[in-house]
Amino acid sequence: MIPRRTALLLVDVQQGFDDPRWGIRNNPEAESRMAELLQAWRDRGLPVIHIQHCSTDPDSPLRPDLPGAALKEATGPRPEELVIQKRVNSAFIQTPLEAHLERQDISALVVVGLTTDHCVSTTVRMAGNLGFTVFLVSDATATFDRGGVDGHWYSAEAIHQIHLASLHGEFCTVLSCSDLLAGLEGGSEPLLPPGSSPRRGSDFQAGASPLHRMKGPSFGPERRQGQEPAPPSPRGFNTAPFAKELP
């Protein structure tokens, strides 16, 4: 059976990223891959979580009062799916995401979205540090060309690949959409790499699909069940009013 505790996390798949001011982007088919995965999750009744960035930058197209803050229609939420709004790069900082995953006993995440090197990377790193098993889908994420401190411009594809390389094996397992879907089609395939264990009790079982054969992430010590979470970061600001769960 498909593991019930594996959630699809769609990070910042918002209309504002179509703004030409972002510049040249890689992976033009990323949203199509996201839509494929979203449909697969829905078909199997697996949990889906949408993350929406509400920027406080007055020049950002992702400001909550602008049309660009809206989630893209092709991957938008259904009424029963959870939407969590954030104001910083990590989807975990001062949002109800971790508490929701705790309540639902979700121990593994499949992460897709925008952009690879900013909110996707930050969310993946924090999820790994919190003890979740994380899978990042390489062709369902994307980024933009960026300038370095020395004035050199780096291509979106180079930035994308470097971030995938730095995340894989340390914070997550990176794999393609086709490999992930092949694993789902296996029916009993666990979304767990060899040698890893679920964050909490779950129904994952051994298997041998492409997912199971891939090198798994190495995590730090897990937080013990029942242990109080760390207090909110003093750097941040209270985003609780901006986090919501749909019915």
Label for each model-derived stretch:
Residues 1-7, 35-39, 44, 56, ...:
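Active-site-adjacent betaalpha module
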Residues 8-13:
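N-terminal nucleotide-binding beta1-loop-alpha1 segment
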Residues 16-20:
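Short acidic, Gly/Ser-rich segments with clustered Asp/Glu that frequently serve as metal-coordination loops
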Residues 21-28, 112-116:
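Short, glycine-rich nucleotide/cofactor-binding loops
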Residues 25-39:
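Short catalytic helix/loop segments, enriched in acidic residues and glycine
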